[in-house]
Amino acid sequence: MQKNIKNVSETEQELEIILSAEEFGTEYNQELEEAKRNIQIKGFRKGHAPASLIKKLAGPSIEATVAEKMASKYFGEIADAEKIKPASRAQIIDVAFAPEELKITLAYEIHPEFEVKDFSGYTFTQNRYVITDEDITREINLILKGHGTLNTVDEAALSTDTVIGDVYKLNEAGETDDDQKTDNHHFTLEYLPEENPFRKALTGKKAGESVDIENDEKESAQPSRFRVVISEIKRLELPELTDELVKEITGGRFESVTDFTADVRIQLEQHFLLKSDEELLESLSAKLIEENPVPAPNSMIASFSKMLLENAKRQMGGSFPKGFDDEQFRLAMKPNAEKHAQWLMISQKIAEDATLSVSDDDIKAYADKEAEKSESMDAEEILKTYLSPEFRDYITDTILKEKIYNIIKSKVTITEEEKSIPVRQE
């Protein structure tokens, strides 16, 4: 066997495999005999047609099958010997068949050769989110909203109230049109953006008042005017947090306000600790990609584009709305997909340079750590799951990523900056 490797680009190669008759002859004869047994030719009993006629009729098909098998047999062997790192499946692009020689040309993408620049001098800022008593109260109030009651109030509307009224669209003369009227429309003000014209106009108004509003938001096709005749202001009244309500809310998991409040704090702290780590990892990866703009194979970009597309689809309930342009979305996501591919290669290179690996002991330690967070499974059960064929690759990849992350963090300078948690509304 002879081989010739041609670099087409940083991420593409072509491999020419040249085989002698001794190397492909046995496979060729087997395929010829198989064809001879199965092909029915008029004038000959099945399996008794001459080889020359079989070659004439089925030769191209036999040659293609032999080339495919020989390529499959030798490509892996050559890739290992030459330390080729394929990023895509090899495709046959040319076959030259002669009685004494078979030439097969394969095209494939590769992981490019590169070195990660020294990053020990990089400095990053990590947000350290501070959880205050006010944050805990706000979070509990969000939970209590699901158990509150809407009561009518004879007061000016607050930005957290619900304003109910009839909505008329006004014509150019400023007159109402009953054909363009919406009865008893509910404006839940706190869920409208602060700059929304309806929120701004209705806040501070009382039942019985009439308000003219010009909707000139960018999302509107053209400016339009409305009149809202307010009939009612409703305000959400939260229930008092008691031990009994805690039992109801948590399904008996907690029995006292004190324990429930402590758990809310723990959940917030864990959430924002994870958020802080994710933000730092995003900063680290962005910097390393910027400093190491490694070319990404198209097959990897396509794979990540598909992943992003499927993620978006799941967020929309499993399917896109009618008329959604999948291809346009892929194009829009391509820069993001390319960064995912670049980060994968950079992190793999860091792992390779540090000779990182994941042992059974690593998996056991990870299972022990996860067991501390679980109330339903012990470490042995979790370990058994992690070592199963269905989960082992996933958990190995998770632990390896953690090791890579720790290596990067150990080499760079990280300063902490206290930050208030963002206020969320539901």
Curated annotation (Swiss-Prot):
Instruction: Name the InterPro entries for this protein.
Output: PPIase_dom_sf, Trig_fac, Trigger_fac_C, Trigger_fac_C_sf, Trigger_fac_ribosome-bd_bac, Trigger_fac_ribosome-bd_sf, Trigger_fact/SurA_dom_sf
In the record, what terms sit under GO molecular function?
Answer: peptidyl-prolyl cis-trans isomerase activity
Chief subcellular location equals cytoplasm
Catalytic activity entry: [protein]-peptidylproline (omega=180) = [protein]-peptidylproline (omega=0)
Tell me where on the tree of life, at the top rank, the source sits: Bacteria
Return the Pfam families for the record. Answer: Trigger_C, Trigger_N
The places in or outside the cell where this protein is found are: Cytoplasm
Which major enzyme category is it? isomerase
Q: Does the keyword Cell division apply?
A: yes
Q: What is its EC number?
A: 5.2.1.8
Can you supply a Gene Ontology BP term from the record?
A: protein folding
What's in the keyword line of the UniProt record?
A: Cell cycle, Cell division, Chaperone, Cytoplasm, Isomerase, Rotamase
What are the residue boundaries of the PPIase FKBP-type domain, all occurrences included? 165-239
Task of the protein: Involved in protein export. Acts as a chaperone by maintaining the newly synthesized protein in an open conformation. Functions as a peptidyl-prolyl cis-trans isomerase.
Can you tell me which family this protein belongs to? Belongs to the FKBP-type PPIase family. Tig subfamily.
Q: What is known of its domains?
A: Consists of 3 domains; the N-terminus binds the ribosome, the middle domain has PPIase activity, while the C-terminus has intrinsic chaperone activity on its own.
Q: What is this protein called?
A: Trigger factor
Task: Provide the taxonomic classification.
Answer: Bacteria, Pseudomonadati, Chlorobiota, Chlorobiia, Chlorobiales
Q: Which gene encodes it?
A: tig
